[in-house]
């Protein structure tokens, strides 16, 4: 028998179970918002306009005309050439990333129409090992650019990457030269390359194809650079300027051409592509 018991107060608030995933926190303003409200806004924070990260498939749905995207090079997968192992085997990491994202590697490539203009479109999947560039990513990009040369099409690459994939060592670094060389052939044919930088675009991706666009666009507040700001600050032992390595800072210093809201990106790409190319009317 309990000698003491807490008297239940009338009208006391009862605990309400809230469905997991119903709310989402903005990484920028730290506000907690109703997830459905954020989804309706195109995965953009209604409070501060910060663009949340989205998957490659979501990005393709935003940019490609409905039903126009034809994926290419979908069967390429890494063979783990170094037999790499850290805390986990590289093969296990690839398998887990594929199960998590539904992608075979960190980039999805194909041909699409963007506002009626045919183009080769490549979109990074940051959820796949941080969008890192290994031999498969470099090969898919190089083949896609070669396809653009063969079909005389412009190229649009949407980057979201932490850089070269360390599990592939020098083979991943070689992809920087491979993609840059492919883009040189594209330029020799007089074909345009539009580079779209999203949060984050860093490391070997920034140091190669991401900054080689004829027109370089970025989403608001995207982190863009080679080494991260913390590493740079510790190396030079000096405070960094406010907003350093964010897209607004790069635009102010002439490193990129445009900052475009996600909801306006497709129309902006369409207008730029139409300047270089004749739009193809949709088939009846």
Question: Which stretches of residues belong to each language-model region?
Answer:
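A structural preference for short, pocket-lining loop segments at secondary-structure junctions
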Residues: 112-123, 140-164
């Amino acid at each position: 028998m309990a000698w003491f018991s807490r008297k239940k107060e009338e009208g006391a608030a009862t605990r309400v179970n809230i469905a997991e995933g119903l709310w989402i926190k903005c990484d920028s303003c730290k506000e907690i918002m109703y997830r459905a409200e954020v989804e309706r806004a195109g995965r953009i924070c209604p409070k501060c306009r910060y663009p949340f990260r989205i998957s490659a498939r979501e990005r393709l749905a935003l940019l490609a005309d409905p039903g126009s995207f034809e994926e290419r090079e979908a069967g390429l997968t890494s063979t783990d050439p170094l037999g790499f192992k850290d805390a986990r085997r590289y093969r296990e990491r690839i398998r887990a990333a594929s199960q998590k994202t539904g992608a075979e590697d960190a980039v999805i490539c194909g041909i699409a129409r963007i506002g009626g203009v045919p183009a080769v479109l490549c979109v990074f999947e940051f959820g796949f090992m941080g969008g890192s560039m290994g031999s498969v990513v470099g090969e898919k990009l190089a083949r896609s650019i070669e396809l653009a040369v063969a079909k005389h099409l412009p190229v649009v690459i949407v980057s979201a990457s932490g850089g070269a994939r360390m599990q592939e060592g020098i083979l991943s670094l070689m992809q920087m030269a491979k993609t840059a060389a492919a883009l040189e052939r594209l330029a020799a044919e007089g074909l345009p390359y539009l580079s779209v930088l999203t949060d984050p675009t860093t490391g070997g991706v920034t140091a190669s194809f991401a900054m080689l666009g004829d027109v370089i666009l970025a989403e608001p507040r995207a982190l863009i650079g080679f080494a991260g700001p913390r590493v740079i600050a510790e190396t030079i032992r000096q405070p960094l300027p406010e907003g350093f390595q964010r897209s607004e800072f790069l635009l102010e210093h002439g490193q990129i051409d445009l900052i475009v809201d996600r909801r306006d990106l497709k129309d902006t790409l369409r207008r730029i592509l139409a300047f270089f190319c004749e739009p193809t009317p949709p088939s009846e």
